[in-house]
Amino acid sequence: MLSSMNWVLLSFIIVLGGGLLLSEGASSSRPPVIKVGAIFGLNTMYGETANIAFKAAEEDVNSDPSFLGGSKLRILMNDAKRSGFLSIMGALQFMETDVVAIIGPQTSIMAHVLSHLANELTVPMLSFTALDPTLSPLQFPFFVQTAPSDLFLMRAIAEMITYYGWSDVVALYNDDDNSRNGVTALGDELEERRCKISYKAVLPLDVVITSPVEIIEELIKIRGMESRVIVVNTFPNTGKMIFKEAERLGMMEKGYVWIATTWLSSVLDSNLPLDTKLVNGVLTLRLHTPDSRKKRDFAARWKNKLSNNKTIGLNVYGLYAYDTVWIIARAVKTLLEAGGNLSFSNDAKLGSLKGEALNLSALSRFDQGSQLLDYIVHTKMSGLTGPVQFHPDRSMLQPSYDIINLVDDRVHQIGYWSNYSGLSIVPPESFYSKPPNRSSSNQHLNSVTWPGGTSVTPRGWIFRNNGRRLRIGVPDRASFKDFVSRVNGSSNKVQGYCIDVFEAAVKLLSYPVPHEFIFFGDGLTNPNYNELVNKVTTGVDFDAVVGDIAIVTKRTRIVDFTQPYIESGLVVVAPVTRLNENPWAFLRPFTLPMWAVTASFFVIVGAAIWILEHRINDEFRGPPRRQIITILWFTFSTMFFSHRETTVSTLGRMVLLIWLFVVLIITSSYTASLTSILTVQQLNSPIKGVDTLISSTGRIGFQVGSFAENYMTDELNIASSRLVPLASPEEYANALQNGTVAAIVDERPYIDLFLSDYCKFAIRGQEFTRCGWGFAFPRDSPLAVDMSTAILGLSETGELQKIHDRWLSKSNCSSPHGSQSGDSEQLNVHSFWGMFLVVGIACLVALFIHFFKIIRDFCKDTPEVVVEEAIPSPKSSRLTKLQTFLAFVDEKEEETKRRLKRKRNNDHSMNANSIISRTASRRPI
């Protein structure tokens, strides 16, 4: 489009060229009048407001003669009359009159065109109404947007849509660059937030619309769609016509959401004719301008003097128009103070284009245009709109918007949006001194009165039936009919667990969902579930699929599933036999090393306690044969806590207490393991789970129509020649009993139902996939989200479990067998080594203390023993000493204490006699 517009521009220049006069030379460096052009339609809301603001700004700049060094600022207004042709003509005329900058044009489409002229003649062009997001400074370096780009407006709308939880919107817009590119930006912003524009309604320009027929046609289309969130990004006249016809079509009632861009707030602020009843409940946005004394004074001035008793009110674009003039004035002032000139010259490129009726040299090139542009984009000032400053990418600093709700002829501000802080209920400037926090918990808006007068946030969509019922595909199964089946003698009545869950979830929805069930399959064999799911994607056969549909990756790429209503996964089932037929089953709880270690510790602990008790406890003394029997009886009777011998020593009691705790743990574990072995059936199949199933060569059964076949061939690399299709539980049982298959791989719910009737089989190993069953809907279907919420509600209230128990909890088997299968794990030493270690350390510590005391007493008693046993020779052999020590150890502790006491008494007597002898020898004779 831009290249074609350039050709249009060139043709206008050629037509105009014959009437242009040759310029006499460059202007003076500091002319008495500094000219700024402005291109607006004075018969439009924006143009009329801008014209008043321009005059006010011009008056204020010129009120101080020294501001521009004695020069006066003059705004040259060109009335484009909403005509692209006149906009081009006005720009060309300005280029003849040595303007330093141009304010405008009013529309983005003309901004695209005239920016090429500004680039060539280096004349800065500033606009506060042409806010097309695609007007890039890289492509148009001399075009500057002095108000926030519509990119931020669309970002604000996208965050509002996300905040209220909507996912689909409809966009209404005029067929021009600004509206079209704004909607494109909205689509991009929504996509980043996992939302989308489901329909774009393009309307002609408002200058073209002569009757509301096209608007009515689009609104009727929208009324028949699911989405009820409508964004209106149009010109004011078109927007007012849209709301008028929407009211007539009943589209301003409860359930609808209308979001109008800044055009609606501008209409309200400008006091233009508008039936506010037509926009009751509508949300709109307004460029946010902080409250300030300067702004309040200007508003009062506008009301009293500037509008010349006209009805036009001050809208936010009047503030931006005023600030735009000041941006140019300050930039010119900076340029002049820096010693710059304001000079104009002929463009060499245009001068080379000569002909008999062609003279383009009258178009002046602004020599200091690049310098002035640089000063413009580096402007920092406080204006009516707040702080004025540009980012390096030339976007305005801290773009923000007021969010307005129109209620009963009143403007109710529900919050703000800022690119810095997001949605808030306090002015965004209060956040600028803090670190940005865009988390969802910090996004807030006040309550809204929506169309229809409700304060409840609309769902944003409705169930679209278009006069027909929702067509729901259900598998016409030949087996496992407890999940879904045809009612006998009926062509469209369905029953089963899956159907009851679906119907219960539908009842929880806040809106009716008329539906009908349509069978898929012949009822003789189970249908292919992948084909059934594919039917949803076309929208021709089914609008949804209900049944035992596994949620697998391949299917999630083409449809949306609800929250799973039952857990599932592939399992292996194989034949079983009872382990309690083995007479030696009581030995299986422990491994052989465990039995050996346990028996050894019984003996070790018994021996340790005998050593600790032997010298002080008569029950542990006597002939060797009796003592051995005592040790064995005592230690093994601790297994049943029935030992009759009492322990006397402190060390013995400590060891016994620790050992009894260990025995308690061991016996409890043995009892539990033996109970499991005697009650749980064990598989006689060599297949322990999916790993041994893969490595074996046996044949594997699977259910016809299940995804298990593709999973085993594609994911587990099992040869298809090993797979055997089976159609019913009866075929499952026959194939397993006859050895046709070594095992069957199927989903857990089917196997649980199968095992409730066939008790000679059990699940082998654990589930090797994790998935669930859900209901399938087309991609991005809002009904899938609401049904997921309903299923969660069923789960929380316990209703889902009640439905499960009603259909799937029956069992004809006397004992559970499917929940856990395979050989029970035997208990080994590794499970108890910590306790054995504690017992061993306790025994060693106790024996160490015991022998330390014995050796100490033996050392004290040794001389006495030697005298009494008449062994006076100091050359006694080591064997003799050992025999003496063993005799001491075997001796009862009471005798040792008695002997030590007698020894101490003898020592006292000898000491007394010695003292008496020494005393007698000292007496005189």
Curated annotation (Swiss-Prot):
InterPro entries from the UniProt entry: ANF_lig-bd_rcpt, GABAb_receptor_plant_PBP1, Ionotropic_Glu_rcpt, Iontro_rcpt_C, Iontropic_Glu_rcpt_pln, Peripla_BP_I, Solute-binding_3/MltF_N
Molecular function (Gene Ontology), one example: ligand-gated monoatomic ion channel activity
UniProt KW Signal keyword: yes
Membrane-traversing stretches: 592-612, 622-642, 654-674, 832-852
Localization (cell): Membrane
Membrane topology note: Multi-pass membrane protein
Name of protein: Glutamate receptor 3.1
Organism in which the protein naturally occurs: Arabidopsis thaliana (Mouse-ear cress)
